[in-house]
């Protein structure tokens, strides 16, 4: 488009020269202005760049103006937002000669009707990253997207500006919702959509040698309907009476901010899947974190606890109701009567009085009394800073139970002088009733002994079908003797610290997307973070309290272990004067990172992984360790192995695609002259201890020269140092970025064509919600 130049020029009559003088005449051309643009039209609310050319003057600057919309000093037109097309005029005026200008007519085109063009969504799979971008046409950008009705799957979020659905779904099903888009002119459009999430852990499926859970609990609020009446219990009211009188389908609200002291027995009623009883704070849902979001003590008015990760409170208003156990011993404040079923708890603080004696379980079943269908949702469950409290919730004897989006703190036992030796945030696996399925999802779990433990007591059955996902398992460093701000028992003795996650009796367990931080030795254990040890222990006068106990079909994947004395302990071993348990094996461990494993800093054993059999029968077998990125203590082995040569060999051992620090003694014996690993030569150890085995495509970083490649099984790698591997950021194996650079020699070098070591992207997607 070219505009005609404006004519604002003038001429000057030359003076008359004296006689005999030659005069040169100077004629001044008028200043001319022209404007141009790449188009004669622009969309509603759009932009169009204009250019001005000024002739016959050294000052080529112009002033811009427009009849509608706005235009910058550089000539960029911002068109008005119009509902019908119309013409506007753009003017460029010479600064040197304000009478000289040029104009251009531009058609502003009305936007097409706003419409969402996305009408179907691709399906997703639980546990796998999902991404989909919604599209719209017409209207005037930018767009803003919201969910108008319905809900997204847990783990999926809508980004309002980008219109993208992303995250890692944790529950299968078909989710129906309506999405709304609004343009900058405040026009709106809606579209009904359905997102189908398939279950990657359907009944009968496997991860390597391990069978995955056969049953998964659906625990959304929509899955626990309570269509009955609501009863409110205010401060000073009778909560127990409300429990006793509630009908199936009712809701009991406890006054937000109020304290309800006592021991409350949750009674048996003939409820069903369509008629749950909900017990919750009276605060509205808008005062709590959204469903699927972890609660913190902020919602009980506590801005921060010493030594814990930041709560990042947006406010500290107390909107929770508190149940507090006032007894001097025993368990409480919540006990389930025999047969109690279909109860959901939301937005409550559950605790005990300080300064009292040892308390066992804050939440649990009555002794030898089964319960079922229990959901703890957005709860703060905690002991006190110095007192002994054994467990937050005890799941033994409970079936179909879930702990979701909750916060557990201050469960600990005092060393030497204490009344207990093991404390857990969540425990189970004892007693004589069927147990499971369980769902432990998106919680902060803190305890001195084991953050999560299944087993360790008398039992005739094994809990099964256990889903443990996207939790943060944490021990405060202020519990470590000698650490600044040390906190111990009332007498100053330290708390007994053992590990983060231990199984002594469990089967079909999926442990995925979890963050494990801080554990140390110095007590009865050696600071391993993860322990898989089936136990038929001595309890009381019984020396074989659980011959039926087993740990089988365990999948550990897409998780991180940091700040520990040792990594993973896999052992079938007799201990505590007990006997041989029923079984241990079929473990799939893959895509896990282990860093800051330091035996000196955390007072413990040091090996990255221990694999040991101490039984003459029910031999350990079916172990797959694949795609691990791990940096153990440099003075300890990457793999410690043990089995007496009088026992059958351990079977079906797979160790592939791992990227680990070799250590001073890369593959070493767990001890004893009759140990199959006594030679400590890697090839000899592997072939003597395991049959059959697969041991290929592993990179052992900084292997000592003594352990030359000829002393190893074939087809493995020996990078001289971490720099040779080409991590994105090794950071001395402390919180680094363990992606491989594109030029790494171990890029796509695995048996499956993937990078050696863990899939860092997959881990990050899984643990995003765990922090």
Identify the residue ranges that each predicted region occupies:
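C-terminal edge beta-strand
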Residues: 102-109, 187-199
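Extracellular beta-strand/beta-solenoid scaffold signature
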Residues: 274-277, 319-335, 356-367, 385-396, ...
């Amino acid at each position: 488009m070219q505009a005609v130049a404006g004519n604002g020029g003038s001429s000057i009559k030359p003076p008359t020269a004296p006689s005999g003088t030659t005069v040169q005449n100077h004629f001044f051309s008028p200043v001319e202005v022209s404007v141009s643009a790449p188009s004669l039209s622009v969309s509603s609310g759009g932009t169009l760049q204009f250019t001005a050319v000024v002739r016959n003057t050294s000052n080529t600057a112009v002033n811009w103006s427009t009849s509608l919309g706005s235009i910058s000093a550089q000539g960029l037109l911002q068109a008005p937002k119009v509902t019908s097309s119309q013409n506007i005029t753009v003017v460029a005026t010479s600064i040197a000669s304000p009478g000289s200008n040029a104009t251009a007519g531009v058609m502003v085109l009305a936007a097409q009707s706003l419409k969402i063009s996305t009408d179907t969504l691709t399906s997703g799979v639980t546990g796998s990253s999902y991404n989909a971008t919604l599209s719209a046409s017409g209207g005037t950008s930018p767009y803003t997207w919201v969910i108008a009705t319905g809900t997204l799957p847990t783990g999926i979020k809508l980004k309002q500006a980008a219109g993208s659905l992303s995250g890692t779904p944790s529950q299968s099903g078909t989710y129906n919702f309506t999405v709304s888009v609004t343009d900058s002119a405040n026009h709106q459009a809606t579209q009904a959509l359905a997102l189908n999430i398939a279950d990657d852990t359907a009944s009968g499926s496997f991860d390597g040698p391990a069978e995955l859970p056969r049953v998964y609990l659906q625990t959304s609020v929509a899955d626990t309907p309570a269509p009955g009446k609501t009863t409110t219990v205010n401060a000073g009211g009778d909560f127990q009476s409300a429990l006793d009188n509630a009908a199936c389908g009712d809701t009991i609200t406890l006054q937000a901010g109020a304290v309800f002291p006592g021991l409350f027995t949750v009674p048996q009623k003939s409820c069903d899947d369509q008629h749950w009883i909900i017990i919750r704070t009276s605060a509205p849902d808008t005062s709590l974190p959204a469903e699927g979001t972890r609660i913190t003590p902020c919602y009980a008015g506590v801005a921060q606890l010493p030594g814990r990760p930041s709560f990042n409170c947006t406010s500290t208003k107390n909107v929770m109701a508190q149940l507090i156990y006032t007894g001097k011993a025993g368990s409480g404040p919540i006990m389930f009567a025999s047969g109690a079923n279909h109860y959901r708890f939301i937005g409550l603080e559950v605790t005990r009085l300080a300064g009292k004696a040892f308390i066992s379980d804050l939440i649990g079943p009555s002794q030898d009394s089964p319960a079922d269908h229990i959901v703890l949702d957005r709860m703060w469950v905690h002991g006190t800073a110095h007192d002994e409290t054994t467990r937050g919730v005890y799941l033994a004897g409970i079936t179909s139970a879930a702990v979701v989006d909750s916060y557990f703190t201050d469960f600990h036992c005092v060393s030497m002088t204490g009344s207990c030796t093991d404390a857990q945030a969540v425990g189970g696996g004892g007693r004589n009733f069927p147990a499971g399925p369980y769902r432990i999802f998106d919680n902060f779990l803190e305890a001195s002994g084991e953050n999560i433990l299944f087993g360790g007591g008398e039992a005739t059955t094994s809990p099964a079908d256990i889903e443990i996902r996207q939790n943060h398992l944490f021990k405060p460093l202020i519990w470590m003797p000698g650490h600044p701000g040390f906190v111990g028992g009332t007498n100053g003795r330290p708390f007994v610290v053992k590990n983060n996650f231990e199984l002594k009796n469990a089967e079909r367990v999926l442990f995925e997307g979890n963050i494990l931080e801080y554990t140390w030795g110095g007590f009865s254990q050696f600071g391993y973070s993860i322990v898989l040890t089936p136990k038929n222990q001595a309890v009381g006068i019984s020396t074989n309290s659980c011959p039926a106990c087993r740990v089988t079909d365990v999948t550990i994947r897409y998780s991180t272990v940091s700040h520990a004395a040792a990594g993973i302990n896999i052992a079938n071993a007799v201990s505590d004067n007990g006997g041989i348990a029923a079984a241990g094996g079929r473990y799939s461990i893959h895509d896990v990172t282990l860093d800051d494993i330091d035996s000196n800093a955390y007072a413990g054993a040091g090996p990255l992984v221990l694999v040991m059999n101490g039984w003459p029968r029910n031999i350990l077998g079916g172990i797959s360790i694949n795609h691990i990125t791990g940096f153990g203590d440099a003075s300890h082995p990457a793999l410690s192995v043990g089995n007496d040569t009088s026992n059958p060999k351990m079977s079906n051992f797979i160790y592939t695609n791992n990227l680990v620090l070799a250590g001073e003694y890369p593959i070493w014996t767990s001890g004893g002259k009759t140990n199959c690993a006594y030679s400590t030569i890697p090839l000899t150890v592997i072939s003597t201890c395991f049959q059959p085995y697969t041991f290929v495509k592993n990179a052992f970083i900084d292997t000592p020269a003594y352990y030359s490649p000829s002393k190893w099984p074939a087809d493995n790698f020996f990078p001289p140092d971490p720099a040779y591997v080409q991590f994105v950021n090794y950071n001395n194996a402390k919180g680094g970025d363990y992606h491989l650079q594109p030029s790494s020699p171990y890029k796509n070098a695995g048996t499956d064509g993937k990078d050696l070591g863990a899939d860092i992207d997959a881990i990050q997607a899984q643990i995003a919600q765990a922090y």
